[in-house]
Amino acid sequence: YNEEGSLASTIESLKASSFDGDYLVINDGSKDRTAEICRENEYPFLDLPVNLGLAGAFQAGMKYAYRHHYDCAIQFDADGQHLPEYIPLLEKAVQENDIAIGSRFVTKKKPSSMRMLGSNLIEVAIKLTTGETIKDPTSGMRAFNGRMIEQMAKGLNFGPEPDTVSYLIKRADAKVVEVPVEMAERTAGESYLNLGNSAKYMLRMTVSILFMQVIRKRIGR
């Protein structure tokens, strides 16, 4: 959403890397020149008429992947933070797992900050409800195999959030693995996750994992 400042450089770095798959831009009702940049550069994109938010945009991409019979889909931000050299590792990881998370903290300690405190709370909530340890639950760089693509495409309110991952572990027997990655700084624009929004997000995720996800129905394989 509104990533005109970094979209072209992100896609060009993707195309210049060893990545040899397809890509699709999800324009989530952006008010900037995102759509024009896609048309000018002939980038394949879905142009959503209104801003659906992260969950809606993500599910639109998953519906596309499911309808076109992809067996792997990778969530990749347009702000320049995600690095394309890690895509092959994520793709390989979902050959034997359902979800692969690009993790900054598999081998590194989390820095001390309010945002990382929230990440720790979510990590504990996932551990309590699923028995699994996910060191970087808020990472936005994730890969999904064909089974998860179908679940995400057909399910209601399935977004790329820690509470959904927790639910899929508990109710769909999803196998989740973390792949060590490095991430860059945002190259343009501003993140919506300022201090206030980050605190609200972390609290909402923690409550959802602890109290809401555990009562949702199990889904079949």
Model-derived features with residue positions:
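Short beta-strand-to-loop acidic/aromatic patch adjacent to the donor-nucleotide binding site
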Residues: Y70-Q81
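A conserved acidic beta->alpha catalytic loop
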Residues: N27-A35, G80
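Conserved short acidic donor-positioning loop in nucleotide-sugar-dependent glycosyltransferases
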Residues: L14, D28-G29, L52, G61
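Conserved catalytic loops of nucleotide-sugar-dependent glycosyltransferases that act on lipid-linked
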Residues: A57-F58, Q81, E85, P111-G220
